[in-house]
């Protein structure tokens, strides 16, 4: 009998074990689609980004014009640019939903997978930040100035670090060229980390909505979940293309249509919508170093979630108190996102401070306490 190439070929076997014959819990819901959607986002961003990089010029005198040239003169350049810019938004929507799923269903108990996931989030945020600087509009320039300046809050080495990052004494040509280099490099780092993320996930297998072992009831990934994933791809790509074609600038800042001018500061400096929650936390602390630490903590706190899990149950499916807290946290992050887009004045300052305090309190204090209380109530 002829050998099955799919199961015996050294390379095809790896693909087979990851995407075809992978034993998968039979009850995972649509919340488990976001991992594959993130993969599609990554591939889309790399392809569109590569096409844009072929026509872009990383020079302060030419960057803005080169982006205009892409949109006006390159075949379908406007579409490629709009897909790339809005693709970033979809990437963040998917990753936030993916993290939310992980928090709700206790997937963070796969510690290695979770920790690499958090590193992936940090890499994605870094990539998006350096990418936003490249069109060299007003918000690109001032966003880069404000965010890189935060490193100067680090005691002793801060100022040296900032000037080293800038390649001079202000955000200028060296900054733009190195940001372009980093923006080109980081997606491939993300690809590598994604493979490690998947390797660790396939060591344990997927979690499921009940949070109980599912070894007794596994089904092959193909055809069941390949079909389910393709439905997700179609829906997401339809939404992305619709956004890119009908209102490509909906999520952007009008300020970025003005070329960068170091002599004119925009009235409201704010990042893209997907960073607003962290920006609100940064702004809510009146001290520079304190704000930077809070900003870092807002993401790094995710590393602590596996250590703060006190419940005897893995998932929140059967934990109503934790569910209430979880949805309060979601609402809280949305409030932070809104506050981050508002000017620094009353009442937004106090709302931001309360929301920032609540964010950390829910994650660090209330989640573990609620879980302990539920253990008692359920006599576990």
Swiss-Prot record:
A Pfam match: Cytochrom_B_C
Cellular location(s): Mitochondrion inner membrane
Record-level Gene Ontology MF annotations: metal ion binding; ubiquinol-cytochrome-c reductase activity
Keyword presence, Ribosomal protein: no
Domain of life: Eukaryota
UniProt remark on cofactor binding: Binds 2 heme b groups non-covalently.
Names of the cofactor(s): heme b
Further remark: Heme 1 (or BL or b562) is low-potential and absorbs at about 562 nm, and heme 2 (or BH or b566) is high-potential and absorbs at about 566 nm.
Subunit structure: The cytochrome bc1 complex contains 11 subunits: 3 respiratory subunits (MT-CYB, CYC1 and UQCRFS1), 2 core proteins (UQCRC1 and UQCRC2) and 6 low-molecular weight proteins (UQCRH/QCR6, UQCRB/QCR7, UQCRQ/QCR8, UQCR10/QCR9, UQCR11/QCR10 and a cleavage product of UQCRFS1). This cytochrome bc1 complex then forms a dimer.
Name of this protein: Cytochrome b
Organism: Icteria virens
């Amino acid at each position: 009998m002829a050998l099955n190439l799919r199961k015996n070929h050294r390379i095809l076997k790896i693909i087979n074990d990851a995407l075809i014959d992978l034993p998968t819990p039979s009850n995972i819901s649509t919340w488990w689609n976001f991992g594959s959607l993130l993969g599609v986002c990554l591939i889309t961003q790399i392809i569109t980004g590569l096409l844009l990089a072929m026509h872009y010029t990383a020079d302060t005198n030419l960057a803005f014009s080169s982006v205009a040239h892409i949109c006006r003169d390159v075949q379908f350049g406007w579409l490629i640019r709009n897909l790339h810019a809005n693709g970033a938004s979809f990437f963040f929507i998917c990753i936030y939903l993916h993290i939310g799923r992980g928090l709700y269903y206790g997937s963070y108990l796969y510690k290695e997978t979770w920790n690499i996931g958090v590193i992936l989030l940090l890499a994605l945020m870094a990539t998006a930040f350096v990418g936003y600087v490249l069109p060299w509009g007003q918000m690109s320039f001032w966003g880069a100035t404000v965010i890189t300046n935060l490193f100067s809050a680090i005691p002793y080495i801060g100022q040296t670090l900032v000037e080293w990052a800038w390649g001079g004494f202000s955000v200028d040509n060296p900054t733009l060229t190195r940001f372009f280099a980093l923006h080109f490099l980081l997606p491939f780092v993300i690809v590598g980390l994604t493979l490690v993320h998947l390797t660790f996930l396939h060591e344990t297998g997927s979690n499921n909505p009940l949070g109980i072992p599912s070894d007794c009831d596994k089904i092959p990934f193909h055809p069941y979940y390949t079909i389910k994933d393709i439905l997700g791809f179609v829906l997401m790509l339809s939404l992305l293309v619709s956004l890119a074609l009908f209102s490509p600038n909906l999520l952007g800042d009008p300020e970025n249509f003005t070329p960068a001018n170091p002599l004119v500061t925009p009235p409201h400096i704010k990042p893209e919508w997907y960073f607003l929650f962290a920006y609100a936390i940064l702004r809510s602390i009146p001290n520079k170093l304190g704000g930077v630490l809070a900003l870092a903590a807002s993401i790094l706190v995710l590393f602590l979630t596996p250590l703060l899990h006190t419940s005897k149950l893995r998932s929140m499916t059967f934990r109503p108190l934790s569910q209430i807290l979880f949805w309060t946290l979601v609402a809280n992050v949305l409030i932070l996102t809104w506050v981050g887009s508002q000017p620094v004045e009353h009442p937004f300052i106090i709302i931001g401070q309360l929301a920032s305090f609540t964010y950390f309190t829910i994650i660090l204090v209330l989640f573990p306490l609620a879980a302990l209380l539920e253990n008692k109530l359920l006599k576990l």
